[in-house]
C-alpha cells in the first residue's frame, strides 16, 4: 500500500490488548488490528497526494533497493522507504550501532534537500525573497514524498518559522521554532504526541538547542584545543586546517553525546536495549550523511538523463555501501548494543537532570570534570563487578513464554541451555544481568528451543554453540545462518560421555549415544548437571524434550538427583512412576507447561509422590 490508499476488506478484528503494544496503539488512536481475509475494493490516492505517492514509487523503482544493501539504504534516506532495510536486516545493524537516526528521514535530510533547492534557484538568478519562499514550498514536497514521518514534518515547520522570522527581520531561535512546530503538530493531530519518532525528534532538537553550546564548552574544558605552538610537528600550512578539524570533531561528538543522553531513557524503555558505540559511530559515519543524501537526491533528479543519471546513482550506491560497511564494523564490536530492563519512571531522569542543569548552569572546570568523571567511572566499575562478576552459582529457569531456556551461572561465567521460542530471551537475560554467554547448548531443533538464537546473534556475545552429535550438519538454512552470526563457523557436538565445565559446574552428556539429526524429541541432549559435593552440592537432570523411553536408557547412570527438568513440558509420556522413584527427587522439579501441551495430571501425581517439595511452573500462551 502507498500513502493515501484506502481498502475495503473482509477480515477479523482484534481489539488492543493490555500489553505494551496495545497501550502504545491505543495512545496513537489505533483501535485494534484487522487480519484481512479478502480485499473487496481499493481506492488509490488522488490529487497532490496521489501524484507524490506515484513519484515516490517511481523513485524507489529507479533506486531498485532489492539489488543490494547500498541501494536499500538509499531508498530509506532519499524516499523514506525502509522495506528492504528491514528485509535485509540492516535496520537491526544500524540500531545496534546507534545510527538509526541516519536512516530515518529527519531535519538533517530536509536541510540538505532545502539547501539543494535553494542553490538551484540561486543559480537560476531568482531574487532573495521569492527564492526563500520557492525553496520552502519545493522542500515541503520532500516531506509527503517520504511518507510524512513526524521528524520530517517537525523539521519543515521549524524551517518555515525560521524563514518567516527572517522575512520579518528577526533572528532565528531554535527553541521558539521547536515550540511552534510541536504545538501546531499536536493541535492538528493530538495522537502524534505519543508517536515515538515525534518524541525522539523533539527531545533531540530541544537538547541540542539548549545544551549543545554547553556540551562543546565542557569538552573544550576537559580536552583543551591544541594551540599552534603545540602543533610543532605539524607543517605550518596545515595547522589552521588541523585546528578546524579538531573543532569539528569536538562539535560533532558534543552533539552526538547530547542526543544520546537525552533520548537513552526513552529508547531503553521502549526497545529494551541501548547502544554503547553510538557517539563514536556517529563521529565516523555522520560526515558521510550529507554527501550521501545529496548524491542520492541529485541522482534521482537526473535519473532520466541516460549516462549522468546512472553514473550519479553508482556514486551514491558506492557511498551507501561504505556507510553500511562502517556501520557493520561498529555493530560487530563486543557489547555494541546491550539489552537492559528499565522501569518506565526512568524516562523522567533526563528531564530532571536537564532542569537542574538549566537552574544551576555550573561553569565547566577541568579539575571538577576530571573528578566527577573518575568518580562516575569508579561507581560504574563497582556496579559492573557486583552485577556481572561477583555472581553466586545458580541455575535459573527463564520465563520466555512457550519454550525452554535454562541459565547456568557461576561468577562471570554463564551458559544457556536452549533459547526459547523467540525474541523474549534477550529481555530474560537482561533481567538476570547477563551481558555475555560462554556457551549455548541447543538440546534439539524444535522452534520452542531454538527460536531465540536469532535474537541473541549480534546482541549477546557468545563463545560456543553445542548441539547433539550429527545435528550440526542438519541445521535448517535459516537456523544455520543465525548460528554463524552467533558464534561463527565452529559449532560443537555433544554425545554421551562428553563434559562441559562452567566455573564449579560440570555438565555430563548422557544422551544421545549415536548420530541424530535433532528433529525428534528423542534426539534431545540430556545433561546431568552437578555442583559441589554432598549435602551442599546440587545434582540436576536437564532432559530437553526427551520422554520416558529415553529416561529408561539413562536413569541408571543418574542416581539420586535434587532437581529434574521434566521432558516435553510434562506430557503424558514424559515420566513414569518407576523412573520417578529411581531418581529420588529431593526438593523440586520445575516444569514448563503450555496451552497446547499441558502438564498432565498423571505426571503431576508421579512427581508429587517422588518429590515432596515439587513445584510446577506454568506459562500460558496468549
Model feature map: region roles:
Residues 27-156, 163-164, 417, 539-544, ...:
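Aromatic-rich juxtamembrane segments at the membrane interface
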Residues 110, 150-152, 423-424, 445-450, ...:
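Active-site environment of divalent metal-dependent phosphoester hydrolases
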Amino acid at each position: 500500500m502507498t500513502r493515501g490508499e484506502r481498502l475495503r476488506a473482509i477480515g477479523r478484528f482484534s481489539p488492543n490488548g493490555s500489553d505494551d503494544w496495545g497501550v502504545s496503539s491505543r495512545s496513537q488512536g489505533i483501535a485494534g488490528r484487522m487480519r484481512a481475509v479478502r480485499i473487496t475494493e481499493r481506492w488509490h490516492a488522488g490529487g497532490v497526494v496521489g501524484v507524490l505517492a506515484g513519484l515516490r514509487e517511481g523513485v524507489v523503482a529507479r533506486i531498485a533497493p532489492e539489488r543490494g544493501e547500498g541501494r536499500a539504504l538509499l531508498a530509506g534516506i532519499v524516499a523514506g522507504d525502509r522495506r528492504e532495510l528491514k528485509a535485509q536486516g540492516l535496520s537491526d545493524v544500524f540500531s545496534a550501532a546507534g545510527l538509526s537516526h541516519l536512516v530515518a528521514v529527519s531535519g538533517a535530510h530536509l536541510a540538505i534537500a532545502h539547501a539543494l533547492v535553494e542553490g538551484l534557484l540561486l543559480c537560476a538568478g531568482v531574487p532573495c525573497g521569492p527564492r526563500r519562499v520557492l525553496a520552502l514550498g519545493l522542500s515541503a514536497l520532500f516531506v509527503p514524498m517520504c511518507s510524512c514521518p513526524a521528524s520530517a514534518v517537525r523539521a519543515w515547520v521549524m524551517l518555515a518559522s525560521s524563514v518567516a522570522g527572517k522575512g520579518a527581520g528577526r533572528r532565528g531561535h531554535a527553541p521558539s521554532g521547536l515550540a511552534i512546530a510541536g504545538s501546531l503538530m499536536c493541535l492538528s493531530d493530538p495522537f502524534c504526541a505519543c508517536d515515538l519518532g515525534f518524541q525522539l525528534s523533539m527531545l533531540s532538537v530541544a537538547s541540542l538547542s539548549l545544551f549543545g553550546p554547553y556540551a562543546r564548552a565542557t569538552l573544550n574544558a576537559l580536552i583543551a584545543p591544541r594551540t599552534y605552538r603545540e602543533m610543532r610537528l605539524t607543517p605550518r600550512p596545515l595547522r589552521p586546517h588541523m585546528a578546524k578539524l579538531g573543532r569539528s570533531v569536538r562539535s560533532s561528538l558534543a552533539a552526538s553525546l547530547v542526543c544520546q543522553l537525552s533520548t537513552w531513557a526513552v529508547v531503553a524503555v521502549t526497545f529494551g536495549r541501548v547502544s554503547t558505540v553510538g557517539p563514536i559511530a556517529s563521529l565516523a559515519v555522520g560526515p558521510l550523511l550529507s554527501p550521501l543524501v545529496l548524491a542520492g537526491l541529485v541522482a534521482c533528479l537526473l535519473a532520466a538523463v541516460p549516462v549522468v543519471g546512472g553514473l550519479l546513482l553508482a556514486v551514491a550506491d558506492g557511498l551507501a555501501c561504505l556507510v553500511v560497511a562502517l556501520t557493520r564494523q561498529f555493530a560487530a564490536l563486543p557489547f555494541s548494543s546491550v539489552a537492559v530492563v528499565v522501569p518506565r519512571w526512568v524516562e523522567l531522569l533526563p528531564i530532571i537532570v536537564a532542569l537542574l542543569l538549566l537552574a544551576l548552569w555550573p561553569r565547566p572546570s577541568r579539575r571538577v570534570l576530571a573528578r566527577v568523571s573518575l568518580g562516575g567511572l569508579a561507581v560504574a566499575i563497582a556496579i559492573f563487578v557486583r552485577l556481572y562478576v561477583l555472581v553466586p552459582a545458580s541455575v535459573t529457569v527463564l520465563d520466555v513464554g512457550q519454550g525452554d531456556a535454562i541459565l547456568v551461572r557461576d561468577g562471570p561465567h554463564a551458559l544457556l541451555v536452549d533459547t526459547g521460542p523467540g525474541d523474549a530471551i534477550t529481555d530474560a537475560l537482561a533481567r538476570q544481568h547477563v551481558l555475555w554467554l560462554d556457551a549455548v547448548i541447543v538440546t534439539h531443533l524444535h522452534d520452542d528451543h531454538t527460536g531465540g538464537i536469532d535474537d541473541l546473534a549480534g546482541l549477546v556475545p557468545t563463545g560456543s554453540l553445542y548441539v547433539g552429535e550429527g545435528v550440526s550438519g542438519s541445521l535448517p538454512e535459516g537456523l544455520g545462518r543465525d548460528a554463524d552470526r552467533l558464534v561463527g563457523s565452529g559449532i560443537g557436538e555433544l554425545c554421551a560421555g562428553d563434559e562441559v565445565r562452567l566455573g564449579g559446574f560440570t555438565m555430563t552428556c548422557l544422551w544421545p549415544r549415536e548420530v541424530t539429526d535433532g528433529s525428534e524429541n528423542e534426539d534431545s541432549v540430556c545433561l546431568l548437571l552437578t555442583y559441589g559435593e554432598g549435602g551442599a552440592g546440587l545434582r540436576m537432570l536437564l532432559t530437553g524434550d526427551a520422554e520416558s523411553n529415553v529416561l529408561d536408557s539413562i536413569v541408571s547412570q543418574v542416581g539420586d538427583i535434587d532437581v529434574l527438568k521434566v521432558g516435553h513440558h510434562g506430557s503424558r509420556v514424559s515420566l513414569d512412576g518407576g523412573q520417578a522413584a529411581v531418581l529420588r527427587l529431593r526438593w523440586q522439579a520445575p516444569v514448563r507447561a503450555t496451552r497446547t501441551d499441558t502438564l498432565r495430571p498423571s505426571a503431576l501425581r508421579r512427581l508429587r509422590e517422588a518429590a515432596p517439595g515439587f513445584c510446577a511452573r506454568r506459562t500460558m500462551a496468549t
